[in-house]
């Protein structure tokens, strides 16, 4: 199947035109897309897709096992109300409400800098978000390239950061970013708290990237609170400089695939409530960070 690939930015990302994955895709094509995604620095948009939920899941599994798969762990209980009722592998993002009054998805999902599910021992690798209904204006998603941010640091700073570990904790976001009535207290236990290298290495190409984020990182292991906060705030400000960013303006049918191991993202919630928005996301379980 022929398709066209173009760069999204000078530094990272690719966009693909001319594919109709809903008409079927071979294992070879799916693996080619995985390879192209890795080569693009972990950010790829495939335009004009009409995938069913089942096809979305099938494609996502070529990237790895999914949260919600049989014999795999689900996402945290707090977001269970946003999981697709027929497909536990799909997390829904939406400002719409069903006829029974239940939300069709999370309205204000990801409106802060974060890396998906970084608080698990095996955090998210790829996230595959399919835009099914999109407002005419607004709702962009911004990505920050943490591999480029790491490379831009001085050798001295890299030497300081390389041996450090940081703690990631769902409670960091739950206490501020989620409406308190929907927090499930079970999510505050050890299953949603993990210690990871502050600088992680991708096994596919041995590239290094910063692996901390304001949404879920609580502190750096072994440092006092003031020291930890000073380093983290420096890294956060450094890593969202304009040269590391890509801002995606959504079109209906976009399938956006990003690598949580080397990218942070931020959802801009600037669209009106009366403009419907509905998206479905599959989230791939990654390796234990090293």
Identify the meaning behind each predicted range.
Residues 2-257, 261-290:
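Fe(II)/2-oxoglutarate oxygenase catalytic core
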């Amino acid at each position: 199947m022929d398709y066209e690939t173009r760069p999204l930015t000078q530094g990272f990302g690719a966009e693909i035109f001319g594919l109709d994955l809903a008409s079927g895709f071979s294992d070879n094509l799916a693996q080619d897309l995985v390879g192209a995604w890795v080569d693009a620095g972990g950010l790829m948009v495939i335009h004009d897709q009409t995938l069913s939920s089942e096809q979305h899941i099938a494609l996502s599994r070529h990237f790895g096992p999914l949260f919600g798969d049989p014999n795999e762990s689900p996402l945290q209980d707090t977001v269970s109300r946003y999981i697709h009722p027929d497909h536990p592998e799909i997390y829904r993002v939406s400002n719409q409400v069903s006829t029974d009054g239940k939300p069709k998805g999370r309205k204000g999902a990801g409106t802060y800098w974060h890396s998906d599910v970084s608080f698990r021992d095996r955090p998210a690798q790829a996230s595959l978000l399919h835009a099914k209904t999109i407002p005419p204006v607004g709702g962009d998603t911004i990505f920050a390239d943490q591999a480029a941010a790491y490379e831009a640091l001085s050798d001295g700073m890299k030497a300081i950061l390389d041996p450090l570990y940081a703690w990631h904790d769902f409670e960091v976001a739950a206490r501020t970013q989620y409406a308190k009535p929907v927090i499930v207290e079970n999510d505050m236990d050890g299953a949603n708290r993990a210690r990871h290298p502050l600088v992680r290495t991708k096994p596919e190409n041995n590239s290094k990237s910063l692996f901390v984020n304001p949404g879920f990182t609580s502190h750096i292991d072994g440092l006092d609170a003031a020291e930890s906060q000073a380093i983290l705030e420096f890294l956060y400000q450094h890593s969202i400089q304009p040269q590391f960013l890509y801002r995606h303006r959504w079109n209906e049918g976009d399938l956006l695939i990003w690598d949580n191991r080397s990218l942070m993202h931020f959802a801009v919630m600037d669209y009106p409530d009366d403009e419907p928005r509905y998206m479905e996301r599959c989230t791939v379980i990654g390796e234990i960070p090293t």
